[in-house]
Amino acid sequence: MTMTDPIADFLTRLRNANSAYHDEVSLPHSKLKANIAQILKNEGYISDFRTEDARVGKSLVIQLKYGPSRERSIAGLRRVSKPGLRVYAKSTNLPRVLGGLGVAIISTSSGLLTDRQAARQGVGGEVLAYVW
């Protein structure tokens, strides 16, 4: 069966594994999901990710990050732009998540960027998700 919104599925699997205190979560691989995982790693929300080749298809394995007393690094994830309602932001009107404490993931002509990187480069694009 085809998936209508693979990014929402990615975020939901990550949210569910995080709330169940799993150490890692496995999901179908795509370049877009790997780029989102790279942003999450750079921002300190996950500890690491890797790509595994299976017989059927590639999978992306994400290792979740927790504090010393198992407090979650990811407090929340929200899909913003959906297939039925796309959300775009200009470079002058980029969203701020929790006053700068969270991060907005934006798909730009320069690739996937955080809200801070997009503002620094002066580019806008489609707002994919908020992470805090």
UniProtKB/Swiss-Prot annotation:
Cross-referenced InterPro entries: Ribosomal_uS8, Ribosomal_uS8_CS, Ribosomal_uS8_sf
Quaternary data: Part of the 30S ribosomal subunit. Contacts proteins S5 and S12.
Single annotated GO MF: structural constituent of ribosome
UniProt xrefs under HAMAP family: Ribosomal_uS8_B
Matches recorded under SUPFAM superfamilies: Ribosomal protein S8
Primary role: One of the primary rRNA binding proteins, it binds directly to 16S rRNA central domain where it helps coordinate assembly of the platform of the 30S subunit.
Gene: rpsH
Xref: Pfam families: Ribosomal_S8
Keyword set, alphabetical order: Ribonucleoprotein, Ribosomal protein, RNA-binding, rRNA-binding
Family according to the record: Belongs to the universal ribosomal protein uS8 family.
Gene3D superfamilies hit by this protein: 3.30.1370.30, 3.30.1490.10
GO biological process: translation
Signal sequence, start to end: none
Protein name: Small ribosomal subunit protein uS8
GO CC annotation: ribonucleoprotein complex; ribosome
Highest taxon of source: Bacteria
PANTHER family: 40S RIBOSOMAL PROTEIN S15A
